[in-house]
Swiss-Prot record:
Natural source organism: Milk vetch dwarf virus (isolate 9) (MDV)
Highest taxon in the source lineage: Viruses
Predominant place of localization: virion
Disordered, as annotated region: 1-23
Keyword tags: Capsid protein, T=1 icosahedral capsid protein, Virion
InterPro entries documented for this protein: Nanovirus_coat
Lipid metabolism in keyword set: no
Biased composition (Basic residues): 9-20
Sequence similarity: Belongs to the nanoviridae capsid protein family.
Protein's UniProt keywords contain Lipoprotein: no
UniProt-recorded name of the protein: Capsid protein
Gene Ontology, cellular component aspect: T=1 icosahedral viral capsid
Subcellular location: Virion
Gene name, Swiss-Prot/TrEMBL: DNA-S
Amino acid sequence: MVSNWNRNGMKRRRTPRRGYGRPYKPVVPITRVVVHQSALLKKDEVVGCEIKPDGDVARYKMRKVMLTCTLRMPPGELVNYIIVKSSSPIANWAAAFTAPALLVKESCQDMISIIAKGKVESNGVAGTDCTKSFNKFIRLGAGISQTQHLYVVMYTSVALKVVLEHRVYIEL
């Protein structure tokens, strides 16, 4: 006996005119927005910047983000970074995150959730700067709307220059 149950657990009827219906996923148009930023980071300081589409985009939902960061620093130094989602804007980075480990402080745990994290360590000959970079592709699940905020937060052990580029995949 042939079963009429499909993979989703729903029973489908078959009619003589039309066979079993094919499940389909609705495709929503996606726009790609590239944003380029550069900044100077100070030693032993927690800093961050918001990841959002530039321009006159009023209503959107971010589904994916591709983050590329290039750092120029002396050998033997460390940069920690995390990518967080927040329900409200973050004004004071030092009040929200601990200094070397970038953990969320207890007073902000109900509004900030960590999505991804990582670190960059430099190696090379003493006396010369080396350039390091990292790429991070972040899938945001159901997405982040324009009322929520997405940040990249960094802690560095030495003053350095950062070039941050992100490509945001948004649904309008």
